[in-house]
Amino acid sequence: MKFALGDRKTSWLCVAMLWIFLLILAVLRPLSLPDEGRYADVGRWMLMSGDWLAPRLNGIPFFHKPPLLHWLQAISFSALGVSAWSARLVPAMHAGLMLVVMYLAARTFASERVARNSVLILGSSVGFLISGQYVNHDMLVAAWISMAIWCFALSFKPSQHVDVNLSLLGFAACGFGLLSKGLIGFVLPGLVMVCWLLWTGQFGRVRQMPWIRGILLWSVISLPWFVLGQMKYSELFNYLIIGQHFARYVGDQFNNPWGWWFYGAVLVAMLFPWSLLILQDLRPKAWLMVWQTERKLAARHFESLLWIWTLCISLFFSLPQSKIVGYILPVLPPLACLLALAWEKWLVRGQSAAWFKVMLLVSLVISGVLNWQAGIYSEKRSSKDIALVLACAIEPKDRVYVTHGYPYDLPFYAQLSAPIFVAINWQQARIEQIDNWTRELYEGANFDQTAGQVLVQESAIDDPVQGSWLVAPNDIQLQSLSANWSVYSRGKAWVLLRARSTSVQDSSLESPPTAQGKSLKRCNH
C-alpha cells in the first residue's frame, strides 16, 4: 500500500515532537551521580585543556572508555556554554539518530504505519526518554550499533546485489561505535549480522560486501586515536582493552552483579506499558516453529532480524556477572518494531485502535514522572548547592580539597579551572582495590604522575594554608577534622568548610601543571 505525503509528514512530526520532549526533560533535573557528574566534567576538562588525546577527570587521565562522548561534549560546551543541558545534548542527538534511522529502516522493511508506530513506541518509552538524555556512553554506542545493523541488513536486498553504499555506512557506524564505547561497537553488529545471514540462508552473499573499502573506512574513523594514545601512553591498550573490556566481561570483582533474568526484567520496565504486547502476542516459540518452512522467505527477513538482534545482544550481556541497565539499550529499536508488528496483529483481531493512544499517553506520563523523581533523588545527593557558593567565593589562587568522598559534579557546577586535592588514605585504597571512585583516580594517576599529585594523604588537610577550602559529606563528624576549618556553607548532601589558618601557602603543594589553557566563565567577584 502506498501512503500519501501527509502520512510521512505526520511520521516526521512524531519524530520531532518526541525528540523535543526528550530535550525538555533534559532541562528539568540536575546531574545524576556518579555517571553524569563524572562524564560531564571530563568533557569540560577536555575543553579547558585543549588536549583531545587524553580524557581527564580532575586533571588526571581517564581511559575507561574511548573519547567520542568527550570530544562531542567539548564541542557542545564551546558552542553553547557549559551546562547540564549542553552536556546532555550529545546523548540526545544520538537518541534522535536512533529514532530516525529506525524509522527509515522500518519504513523500508515493513510499512509507513509500522514505522510510525515503532517511532511512537520507542520515542515514548521510559528507556528511551531517560537514557536518551543521560550523560554517559550507552546511548552513543547503542545508536551506532543500531545504525550499523540497520545499514548492513538493508544492504542485503532480496534478489539483488548487496548495496555497497549502505554497507559502507554500516562500516562507518561500526567505527563510531568503537570510538563510543570500545569493541562492542563492531562486535555486536557483526554477531547479529552473522546469525541473521546464517538463519535466512544469505551468508554466501557476504562476498559481495565492499570489505577492503569498508575496513579502510572503519580504520580511518576509529584507529587513529588508539594508535596515537598507545604511542603516548604505553599501557593504554592493556588498561582499556584488556582491563576495561575483557577483565570486566569475565571477572567477578566488579560492581552490579545480577542474575541471568536481569535484562528481561529491565526491558519489560523500559518499554512499559508497551511491553504488555510482547508478553501477550510475541511468542518466540511460535516463531521458531515455522523456521523450517519460512525462515528463508524474504517476507520473514524483517521479523527474523528483529528477534535475532534482540536475542543475540540480550544473551551477550546476560553472560557476565556485572550487569548495568544502560548496556541493553541497543535492543530497544528491534523491540519497538516487534511491538509495532504486534499492534498490527491486535488490529486484525478487532481490538480498538484507541488503546494505542491510551498506552502512548501512559508511557509519556510514566517517563515524565520518573524523570521528575530522578531529579528529586539526584538533588538530594548533588553538591550543586555548595558548588554555586564556592564559585562565588573562591579566588584564583585558592586551593580546594575534598575528603571522605568525591563529589563528581562539584568541579562542573563551580566551574573550577584547577584540579581538586583529594585527601584520603590512598595507600589503603590501593590495597583494597574497590571498584569505585578511588580506583578511577589512582589508576588514572599511573598514566600521569604529575597530574596525580593532587591525590594527597589525609594529613594534608590537618594544617591548611590560607585560601583553602574543604568539601566533605554532610554526615562527617566535624570533630574528626582539624580545628583549623570552619563551616562556610552546608548543603543537602555536602558541607563546605574554609580554612581559618593564615599560614603562608607552600609552593611545593601548588596545583600541578595541567594542559589547561583557559578558564571557563564563573561567578563574578
Describe the role of every protein-language-model region.
Residues 185, 407-411, 478-479:
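Short, active-site-adjacent cap segments at secondary-structure transitions
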Residues 300-303, 356-363, 429-438:
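Long, charged amphipathic helices and adjacent flexible linkers at domain junctions
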Residues 326, 368-391:
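Hydrophobic alpha-helical transmembrane segments in integral membrane proteins
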Residues 337, 343-369:
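Signature aromatic-anchored transmembrane alpha helix within multi-pass, membrane-resident enzymes
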Residues 382-405, 416-525:
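Luminal/periplasmic acceptor-recognition loop/helix of membrane-associated glycosyltransferases
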